[in-house]
């Protein structure tokens, strides 16, 4: 089993990075490696690695434990975790079915002192992943979505044992229920014993003489499954929610796997968003900026009035407190940031031009106007008749 990389290293950060640095690094890397976007072979593994790192470092308690004890402080083998919302997850993966170091050692040397895996022990089913598309406003305020997907369910005909009703699986005659057999091989070091999966029962430890007519001996059947997902207010693009026991059926009576719902949020036509903060560019005429005005500003919570002071410059920022998105972990709403964008008028009529000339003259400005070309001048230019200066 590969050694886990340092979580700070995974996110490209130094130890002790701030919450904002952790969040920004996660958003950048989760988008880069998301399987829906990145089709490289190792993208899914990197995505899961990034998500796992963020799940720990974004939680103050887990981060403190990790900073003090490393992976030992957050390893799930040290205690179970409940379902919930966070940055951790992935699709089509499960840790069930992997033995420990003792199993690997035992498979090479056929040792009798190491522990063995019971092939008939309950095993959790595989996890699944589902992507939900959200409108910008749905992510802000939350919404209930009903999703449908196919998953492996426990076979209703045989109850999951794979045998025809009225019959039962029998202990494998070759491996005697262990799921593995010892094989003697000739190696450069001489003849050695190794352990491999039983070729009769394929590691299950059981033989099914009369398979179930529905699942054909697998114990599972593919079925459509429907789940209602309560999308929390303030969810961001790329974040995930774990729905416990909504994945695929387990084996030998093991629990269902989990479903990881990935949220993809559409862009807004007028707003930008960074976490709970929302940004809006406000178009303002130079007259409004010079003389001041009261304008209407759209927010996700409805229109509000904003006073523009006289002499406002382009690029000036105003803050509308509480008009941003809800903070996912509580603490109210973020703010909306309004940036003034000065609009220069085009296609002025003569009256407007005269007014501007008078304004410039009153201010002591000497403006050299650029004259527009007439129709015949443009025709000359098109046919190379423009005089060289």
UniProtKB/Swiss-Prot annotation:
The record's SUPFAM superfamilies line, in alphabetical order, gives: Chaperone J-domain, DnaJ/Hsp40 cysteine-rich domain, HSP40/DnaJ peptide-binding domain
| InterPro entries assigned | DnaJ, DnaJ_C, DnaJ_domain, DnaJ_domain_CS, HSP40/DnaJ_pept-bd, HSP_DnaJ_Cys-rich_dom, HSP_DnaJ_Cys-rich_dom_sf, J_dom_sf
Report the cofactors. Zn(2+)
Q: Cellular location of this protein?
A: Cytoplasm
Which positions does UniProt annotate for Zn(2+) 1 binding? 155, 158, 212, 215
Key word Metal-binding present? yes
Q: Does the keyword Repeat apply?
A: yes
Q: Where are the zinc fingers (CR-type)?
A: 142-224
> Binding positions for Zn(2+) 2?
172, 175, 198, 201
Keywords for this protein:
Chaperone, Cytoplasm, DNA replication, Metal-binding, Repeat, Stress response, Zinc, Zinc-finger
Which Gene3D superfamilies does this chain map to?
Answer: DnaJ domain, Heat shock protein DnaJ, cysteine-rich domain, Urease metallochaperone UreE, N-terminal domain
Q: What is its main location?
A: cytoplasm
Any GO MF annotation of the entry? ATP binding
J domain segment(s): 6-70
What GO cellular component entries does it have? cytoplasm
BP GO terms, sorted: chaperone cofactor-dependent protein refolding; DNA replication; protein refolding; response to heat
Q: Which parts are the CXXCXGXG motif repeats?
A: 155-162, 172-179, 198-205, 212-219
Domain of life from the UniProt record: Bacteria
Offer one Pfam family short name for this entry: DnaJ_C
Indicate the quaternary assembly. Homodimer.
Q: What is known of its domains?
A: The J domain is necessary and sufficient to stimulate DnaK ATPase activity. Zinc center 1 plays an important role in the autonomous, DnaK-independent chaperone activity of DnaJ. Zinc center 2 is essential for interaction with DnaK and for DnaJ activity.
Entry function: Participates actively in the response to hyperosmotic and heat shock by preventing the aggregation of stress-denatured proteins and by disaggregating proteins, also in an autonomous, DnaK-independent fashion. Unfolded proteins bind initially to DnaJ; upon interaction with the DnaJ-bound protein, DnaK hydrolyzes its bound ATP, resulting in the formation of a stable complex. GrpE releases ADP from DnaK; ATP binding to DnaK triggers the release of the substrate protein, thus completing the reaction cycle.
Family classification: Belongs to the DnaJ family.
**What is the protein name stated in its UniProt record?**
Chaperone protein DnaJ
Protein source organism: Enterococcus faecalis (strain ATCC 700802 / V583)
């Amino acid at each position: 089993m590969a050694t886990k990389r340092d979580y700070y290293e995974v996110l490209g950060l130094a130890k002790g990075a701030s919450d904002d640095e952790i969040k920004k690094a996660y958003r950048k890397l989760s988008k880069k490696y998301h399987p829906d976007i990145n089709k490289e072979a190792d993208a899914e593994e990197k995505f899961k690695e990034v998500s796992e790192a963020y799940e720990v470092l974004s939680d103050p308690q887990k981060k403190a434990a990790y900073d003090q004890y490393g992976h030992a402080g957050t390893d799930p083998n040290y205690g179970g975790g409940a379902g919930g919302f966070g940055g951790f997850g992935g699709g089509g993966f499960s840790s069930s079915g992997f033995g420990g170091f003792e199993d690997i050692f035992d498979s090479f040397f056929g040792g009798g002192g190491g522990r063995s895996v019971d092939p008939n022990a309950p095993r959790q089913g595989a996890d699944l992943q589902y992507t939900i598309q959200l409108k910008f406003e749905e992510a802000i305020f939350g919404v209930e979505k009903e999703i449908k997907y196919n998953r492996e369910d426990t076979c209703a005909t045989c109850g999951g044992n794979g045998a025809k009703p009225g019959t039962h699986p029998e202990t494998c005659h070759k491996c005697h229920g262990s799921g593995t057999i010892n094989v003697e091989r000739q190696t450069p070091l001489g003849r050695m014993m190794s352990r491999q999966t039983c070729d009769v029962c394929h590691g299950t430890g059981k033989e099914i003489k009369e398979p179930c007519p529905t699942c054909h001996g697998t114990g599972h059947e593919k079925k459509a499954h429907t789940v209602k997902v309560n999308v929390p207010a303030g969810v961001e693009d790329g974040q995930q929610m774990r729905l416990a026991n909504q994945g695929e059926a387990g084996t030998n009576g093991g629990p269902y796997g989990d479903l990881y719902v990935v949220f993809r949020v559409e862009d807004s036509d007028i707003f930008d968003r960074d976490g709970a903060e929302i940004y809006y560019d406000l178009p303002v005429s130079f007259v409004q900026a010079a003389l001041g005005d009261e304008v209407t500003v759209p927010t996700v919570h409805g229109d509000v009035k904003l006073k523009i002071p006289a002499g406002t410059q382009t690029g000036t920022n105003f803050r509308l407190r509480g008009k941003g998105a809800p903070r996912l972990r509580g603490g109210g709403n973020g703010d909306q940031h309004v940036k003034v964008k000065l609009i220069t008028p085009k296609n002025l009529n003569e009256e407007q031009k005269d007014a501007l000339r008078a304004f410039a003259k009153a201010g002591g400005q000497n403006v050299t106007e650029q004259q527009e070309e007439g129709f015949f001048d443009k025709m000359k230019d098109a046919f190379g008749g423009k005089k060289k200066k």
